Amino acid sequence: MAADGFRVLVCGGRDYADRDRVFAELDALQPIRMVIHGNARGADALAHQWCLSRRVQAAPCPAKWAKYGKRAGPMRNEAMLGHSPDLVLAFPGGRGTADMMSRARKAGVRVVEVATLRALMGKEGSDADPSV
């Protein structure tokens, strides 16, 4: 961590909607000087809202889907690592989130996975019972 705070990379699913959890996890990591995210809806958008509410610098890294097609996601993940995060805060997500966590670990960046009750119960995924 730099003297003036952490550089935190946030990743997670586009359908992740637990604003309170995102805010609580980021609040617990103080001091934060920058939040790096992929500029997608879901976890990324919630992290950006946190930045605005706390007056913390955001570093959005949007994927260039139109230009690069399927390669855009992994390219965006590499670009986010280029911001030299101190840690990755990973909320539940899919392949893109898994790719980001894998790349971060290979780069020696600490990854903190934020579990949900559904994930802890083994019900994460498309065939999960929505009543849980």
Residue spans of the language-model regions?
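Acidic/glycine-enriched connector segments
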Residues: 2-8, 15-127
